[in-house]
Amino acid sequence: MTNKNAFLEAKTYIPGGVDSPVRAFGSVGSDPVFIDHGNGEFLYDIEGNEYIDYVLSWGPLIFGHCDSDIEEAVIKTAKKGLSFGAPCLLETALAKLVLSKFPWLGKIRFVSSGTEATMSAIRLARGYSKKNGIIKFEGCYHGHSDSLLVKAGSGATTFGYSSSLGVPEDIVKNTHIAIYNDIQSVEQCFKNEDIGVIIVEPIAGNMGLVPADQVFLDALRKLCDEYGAVLIFDEVMSGFRASATGSYEFNKIQADIITFGKVIGGGMSAAAFAAKNEIMEMISPLGGVYQAGTLSGNPVAMAAGLASLSKIYNSPNLYKDLENKSKFIVEALENSAKKAGIALQTEVRGSMWGYFFNDRPVKNYKDALNSDTKMFAKFHAQMIKRGIYLAPSQFETGFVCDKLSQKSLEKTANAIEESFKAL
């Protein structure tokens, strides 16, 4: 079966043919690639084509596809049972491993998705602060829970949605939108509203890769302390991706709550939220903030996460090596764009990298929206034709894995140069 025919059949039974909107390749004007299997840094579609993968399941696969250690842990655990709906030792082991890197956080609760993590973190923060007002930032994506689907990033930006149908005004009336990297817009919210929570991606990855400025994050911490608000860092993407301590490696700010996902599950469906002890004491069964989940902390996902984080902690040069790979790609992009006379902005944070077809530095959502999405679509088409699998949106982040070889990097650089020449 061809990719085109597979997509046609999928659309008969699945809305838009996909289970997550960006996968439909609509923003790049082509049909999606249907994947048969992966191995290392490679993907193989149902037509037998090979691609070097820079999406890596949107971030989780820091050790690439079919990593032997993670596979072994998953298979060994699955043979004992897939899920019990009861406590297991793997939950505690993974909790200890995560918290060892974040000593100011007292406890962690596992869930099954990043959306669950941020949704639960917001509820917990409101319960603790006893205030309903939330500040979120244009272009930051925190999953698809109702109160956070306002000027969100990721697919919401890709498809031009300012919010979502089906979200009542009463749900979002307590969600206040500020401008990323603009502290004055945050201060204005505090002056006019009863704010109990700030949620932010300290390294935004869902409007493209846009790290927050240090002075901006310092000011957020100060405002939360001054007004008695809870500071949530959404590190579903950047946690264990940008570094072994996520954004903390770069900003040294201790958020009150941190959400994790993607890498923490080793490729399985797992996420978490961790908080200071005095906040986490509010969560059920200790306190009155309710949160639960049938598959939360299931043994197979915990085993995958434990294997993934154990490898990370035992690989002292991992993030430096990954950063060098990211820089190699970004330098190839910059050099080829310059030769072609095409404006391009780039960014790197550890194993995360990004680029915008834009003639000005991108510091916020408005800047990102000024990027040339038509040029991006042309570039994406040229790259996938040359066996390079990139995210099908200008507003997503690229990732590298440890399996990515120098040979694959050089093939990528050649594909970049040829693609820019063809634009």
From Swiss-Prot:
Keyword annotations of the record: Cytoplasm, Isomerase, Porphyrin biosynthesis, Pyridoxal phosphate
Record-given protein name: Glutamate-1-semialdehyde 2,1-aminomutase
One GO term of the biological process aspect: protoporphyrinogen IX biosynthetic process
Top EC group: isomerase
UniProt lineage: Bacteria, Pseudomonadati, Campylobacterota, Epsilonproteobacteria, Campylobacterales
Gene Ontology molecular functions: glutamate-1-semialdehyde 2,1-aminomutase activity; pyridoxal phosphate binding; transaminase activity
PANTHER family according to UniProt: GLUTAMATE-1-SEMIALDEHYDE 2,1-AMINOMUTASE (PTHR43713), GLUTAMATE-1-SEMIALDEHYDE 2,1-AMINOMUTASE 1, CHLOROPLASTIC-RELATED (PTHR43713:SF3)
Pathway stated in the Swiss-Prot or TrEMBL entry: Porphyrin-containing compound metabolism; protoporphyrin-IX biosynthesis; 5-aminolevulinate from L-glutamyl-tRNA(Glu): step 2/2
Gene behind the chain: hemL
A Pfam family that the UniProt record links to this protein: Aminotran_3
Signal peptide (UniProt feature, chain positions): none
InterPro entries: 4pyrrol_synth_GluAld_NH2Trfase, Aminotrans_3, Aminotrans_3_PPA_site, PyrdxlP-dep_Trfase, PyrdxlP-dep_Trfase_major, PyrdxlP-dep_Trfase_small
Required cofactor names: pyridoxal 5'-phosphate
One annotated Gene Ontology cellular component of this protein: cytoplasm
Catalytic activity line of the entry: (S)-4-amino-5-oxopentanoate = 5-aminolevulinate
Location of N6-(pyridoxal phosphate)lysine modifications: 262
Cell compartments where the protein resides: Cytoplasm
Listed EC numbers: 5.4.3.8
NCBIfam families attached to this UniProt entry: hemL (TIGR00713), PRK00062.1 (NF000818)
Entry keyword Zinc: no
Protein family membership: Belongs to the class-III pyridoxal-phosphate-dependent aminotransferase family. HemL subfamily.
Self-association state and partner proteins as the record states: Homodimer.
